[in-house]
Amino acid sequence: MELNELTEKIIGCAYEVSNVLGSGFPENVYEKALQHQALKTGLIAERQYQMKVFFDDILVGEFFADLLIGQTVLVEVKAVRALDELHVAQAMNYLKASGMPICLLINFGRPKIEIRRFVPYDVWKEQPHFAHHRIR
C-alpha cells in the first residue's frame, strides 16, 4: 500500500474513534481503540512498539511509540487540551530515531481531533504534497 494511502486510512480510523468516543478519555483508551479500528480495517497495528536510540553505535536509550501501523507509520496518541512544542518535539525525535518514513501525532483531547504529520526531509523532497512538518 502506498504511504499516502496508508496515512489516509489511519486518519480515517482516528476520525471513527473520535466520532464514537468523543473527547475526555485517557490516552491509552484512544490508543487501544485506534489499534482496534486499524486492525478492523485490515491494517497491521502494534501497540507500544519498542525502539532503540543509538549514539556513536552505542545504545543510549529506548522508547515506546504508541502505535506502529502498517509497519511504516508511527502514531503518537495524545489526549490533551492543546498540543504544544514538547509533543511536537517528541513526535519528531521518535521519527528521527526510528528511521520510519512518517509519524502521525493525533490529539483526541478536543471535541475535534487534531492531526499533524511529520516526515523526514528526504521523504518530503520526494513527496512534498504530504508533509505538514518536515524534519532535517
Language-model features and meaning:
Residues 78-125:
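Nucleic-acid nuclease catalytic cores
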Residues 1-44, 113, 119-136:
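Solvent-exposed, charged helical/coil patches
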Residues 1, 5, 25, 29, ...:
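Residues at secondary-structure transition points
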Residues 22, 45, 65-83, 94:
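Conserved catalytic cores of phosphodiester-cleaving nucleases, focusing on short active-site segments
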Residues 31-66:
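Glycine/small-residue-rich phosphate/adenosyl-binding loop
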Residues 17, 21, 25, 56-59, ...:
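Glycine-rich, flexible loop/turn motifs
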